[in-house]
Amino acid sequence: RCRATCILVDIGGEDKVQYIAKVLKDDTNELVRHEAAFSLGQMCYSNGIVPLEDATKNDPSMFVRHEAAIALGVMGSKKVRETLENALNDPDKPVRDSAVVALSNLEFMEKLSKNEKFAKLTGG
């Protein structure tokens, strides 16, 4: 199932997000769900945000919550700030630490996007 998730990422396309999100939500194996969270972060499609937020808040595995928080930070969307701030209160330290890293990444991306030279180079 991990390999299948990776193959979907390699094939690419926003239409694959729904399938990876289903794996993140429903798979019984925390390693597979962790891989799905990582994959959604790497894909960086906005329709991956809600499944990652849900996993950050609700997955029973600290391992998955940690990866979902990191993935949200990688995506760099301001929309996830509240979810990450709430994750600072997670009962597990690795999740709290991941939220700190993710929030730092959001701040970095925000500052970078305000840089005129960077904006010209990236078309934004």
Spans of model-derived segments:
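Amphipathic alpha-helical scaffolding segments comprising HEAT/armadillo-like alpha-solenoid repeats
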Residues: 13-25, 45-57, 77-89, 108-122
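TPR/TPR-like alpha-solenoid helical repeat scaffolds
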Residues: 99-108
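Acidic (E/D-rich), amphipathic helical modules within compact regulatory domains
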Residues: 2-10, 22, 28-35
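Long, ordered, amphipathic alpha-helical scaffolds
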Residues: 73, 78, 97-100
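Short inter-helical turns and helix N-cap capping residues of alpha-solenoid HEAT/ARM repeat scaffolds
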Residues: 28-29, 60-61, 91-92
